[in-house]
């Protein structure tokens, strides 16, 4: 279901100058919450940006009737520290510092250099590139440094 929602709102969000990072549907205390995460290619995502996107996509979602139950729409930035799960997440996070845990229990910190649909390239501290297939990744999380 979130894939259909993503397909419907992505073009609208891009027309406003933002990138759609993620869509998730969760249930908290019997309430359905549709979370839409944005990236602003020109800087930070502000509260005004979130409000603008919310006001545009809310009626669109109501008309499409993807969700049968009542829900709360939450629009936010993708966040400074987040877990990368899909090739799209990796592509939208190029150049960021990440903590990587592999399936073989190896872990390291690196800069995310490149990503495609099969693998991702990390620049290690010694400036070498380590290429890893998605299937070999256990967890990758962006790191924010103050």
Curated annotation (Swiss-Prot):
Task: Tell me its family.
Answer: Belongs to the RimP family.
Please state what the protein is called: Ribosome maturation factor RimP
Q: Identify the InterPro entries for this entry.
A: Ribosome_maturation_RimP, RimP_C, RimP_C_sf, RimP_N, RimP_N_sf
**Keyword field:** Cytoplasm, Ribosome biogenesis
One GO term of the cellular component aspect? cytosol
The superkingdom of the source organism is: Bacteria
Where it sits in the cell: the answer is: Cytoplasm
A GO BP term here is: ribosomal small subunit assembly
Its function, per the record, reads: Required for maturation of 30S ribosomal subunits.
Q: Which Pfam families match?
A: DUF150_C, RimP_N
According to its UniProt entry, this protein's organism is Helicobacter acinonychis (strain Sheeba)
**Keyword Isomerase included in the entry's annotation:** no
